[in-house]
Amino acid sequence: MALATFKATSKLVKGLQVDTHVRNFTVRMDEPPSLGGTDTGMNPVEALLAALGSCQAIVAGAFAKSQGIDLQDFWLDVEGDLDPDGFLKGAPGVRMGFQEVRITPHIKTSSSAEDVAKFIKFVESRCPVGD
């Protein structure tokens, strides 16, 4: 299969508010007041966590049946730790991005614990956002 190209256009609107256009969708991003924004949308690092969780949830939904998993309910808690001083202050030696990302999957199924563990590994391995 040929490479697929995805495109997003992000425009600074006002202050720290950014509207990102993808296909027929617009997503507003902003920062919370504690980081200088007006809290009109999630911030980019929250969007990154949301994208990772959404990607894994989509993989789970797309492949559960073919992997023999009776998927009755599925969600993920995704958390990431970063030091804002990297972005806000340009502090030397402070990593800009996440120092750690934790994903906790929750699954309701009649499948065995062993099959669920294999399925979760499969989901993690097939998510392009987490690659």
Question: Where does each model-flagged region fall?
Answer:
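Extended beta-strand/beta-hairpin segments
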Residues: 1-50, 61-131
